[in-house]
Amino acid sequence: MAKRGKKYVEAAKLVDRASAYSATEAVELVKKTNTAKFDATVEAAFRLGVDPKKADQQIRGAVVLPHGTGKVQRVLVFAKGEKAKEAEAAGAEFVGDADYIGKIQKGWFDFDVVVATPDMMGEVGKLGRVLGPKGLMPNPKTGTVTFDVTKAVNEIKAGKVEYRVDKAGNIHVPIGKVSFEDAKLVENFKTIADTLQKAKPAAAKGTYMKNATVASTMGPGVRVDVSTLA
């Protein structure tokens, strides 16, 4: 295990690991314990009582955070004709079809999110092995396979984030930057928590939201009392 830096060790002393803080207190602590010299990302992590191995307990989707993430997302849209024009008008950085498929196959990845119209998925599907492992493959569940490219691009630019449960039942989602006002980080945090509660599978047994933590990019995790996220 990598040795923690002196600043991290000092910052970690401010966090009582046996305690679960309110969402507001946790956000305040994340700012106090941030050791990065840049505007670090604040990430929320949730441990859910689901079995991701079962198809009816896989949780995946997207939500527009009320205050965005603080990151400018570069959008690539696979579309033709009028839909391509709509994507360009909505502000997508890259719009095209076969030309971009060729570029990606050659190792081009200067984008953060991919949107595709349904009629393009036959071609885009060829990129599954390349885009899939990077979490970039368009998917109807996250609203990135759609004919409404204007809405898709607008939501991404407004701060839409995708979430997906991993094999251990965890979900990690960025909720902003340390430079954000506390109240905005808390509201983003509560928005994703509410979204996950609504996404609870009917087959999930026992405690659903087991725990939640929040941390900055290079800071220690702060445990949150999930009842304060309601």
UniProtKB/Swiss-Prot annotation:
<dbReference type="InterPro" id="IPR016095">
    <property type="entry name" value="Ribosomal_uL1_3-a/b-sand"/>
</dbReference>
<comment type="subunit">
    <text>Part of the 50S ribosomal subunit.</text>
</comment>
<dbReference type="GO" id="GO:0000049">
    <property type="term" value="F:tRNA binding"/>
</dbReference>
<dbReference type="InterPro" id="IPR005878">
    <property type="entry name" value="Ribosom_uL1_bac-type"/>
</dbReference>
<keyword id="KW-0678">Repressor</keyword>
<dbReference type="GO" id="GO:0019843">
    <property type="term" value="F:rRNA binding"/>
</dbReference>
<dbReference type="InterPro" id="IPR028364">
    <property type="entry name" value="Ribosomal_uL1/biogenesis"/>
</dbReference>
<dbReference type="InterPro" id="IPR023673">
    <property type="entry name" value="Ribosomal_uL1_CS"/>
</dbReference>
<keyword id="KW-0694">RNA-binding</keyword>
<dbReference type="GO" id="GO:0006417">
    <property type="term" value="P:regulation of translation"/>
</dbReference>
<protein>
    <recommendedName>
        <fullName>Large ribosomal subunit protein uL1</fullName>
    </recommendedName>
</protein>
<comment type="function">
    <text>Protein L1 is also a translational repressor protein, it controls the translation of the L11 operon by binding to its mRNA.</text>
</comment>
<dbReference type="InterPro" id="IPR002143">
    <property type="entry name" value="Ribosomal_uL1"/>
</dbReference>
<keyword id="KW-0820">tRNA-binding</keyword>
<dbReference type="Pfam" id="PF00687">
    <property type="entry name" value="Ribosomal_L1"/>
</dbReference>
<keyword id="KW-0699">rRNA-binding</keyword>
<comment type="similarity">
    <text>Belongs to the universal ribosomal protein uL1 family.</text>
</comment>
<dbReference type="GO" id="GO:0003735">
    <property type="term" value="F:structural constituent of ribosome"/>
</dbReference>
<dbReference type="GO" id="GO:0015934">
    <property type="term" value="C:large ribosomal subunit"/>
</dbReference>
<keyword id="KW-0810">Translation regulation</keyword>
<dbReference type="GO" id="GO:0006412">
    <property type="term" value="P:translation"/>
</dbReference>
<dbReference type="InterPro" id="IPR023674">
    <property type="entry name" value="Ribosomal_uL1-like"/>
</dbReference>
<keyword id="KW-0689">Ribosomal protein</keyword>
<comment type="function">
    <text>Binds directly to 23S rRNA. The L1 stalk is quite mobile in the ribosome, and is involved in E site tRNA release.</text>
</comment>
<keyword id="KW-0687">Ribonucleoprotein</keyword>
